[in-house]
Amino acid sequence: MKKEKDKKKKRDQKQAASQAARQDAQPAEDSRPLDYFLSVAGGKWKLRILWALHQESPARYRALRSRVPSITDMMLSQSLRELTEDGLLLREQYEEIPPRVEYALSPAGASLAALLEQVAAWERQARR
């Protein structure tokens, strides 16, 4: 009986130590830039939208929809909203009838688009 209590006590201590170690664990210092990049530009559509605006900016919603094949209206509007909130896009709404909204790359978005140019150059070399 005493052996079982001792085993249970040791097991509980190990579990407590393991939980404390997990709580203290933080992402590795060198993974933080990648984590941030993936949080603002990750996903299936955001980089495609940034690339489309890099090719021709500013652009209206329908123009972006035609330049990003097979994206749904819901995903395009959600991605545009998130990219704007994260500071990668600028949204300009004109007080006209009918209403007009244009999206353009912000300075942060333009610097990311420059990196996409390097990715495109890498792709051309890798396919040879």
Please identify what each model-predicted range represents.
Residues 95-116:
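Basic, amphipathic "hinge/linker" alpha-helix immediately C-terminal to the N-terminal HTH DNA-binding motif
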Residues 76, 80-83:
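Basic amphipathic alpha-helical segments that dock to polyanions
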Residues 1-41:
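N-terminal leader segment of winged-helix/HTH proteins
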Residues 28-75, 96, 102:
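N-terminal helix-turn-helix DNA-binding core of bacterial DNA-binding proteins
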Residues 84-92:
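A short, conserved structural fragment
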Residues 35, 51, 78, 114, ...:
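A cross-family signal for key residues in well-ordered alpha-helices
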Residues 111-127:
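Short, solvent-exposed amphipathic helices
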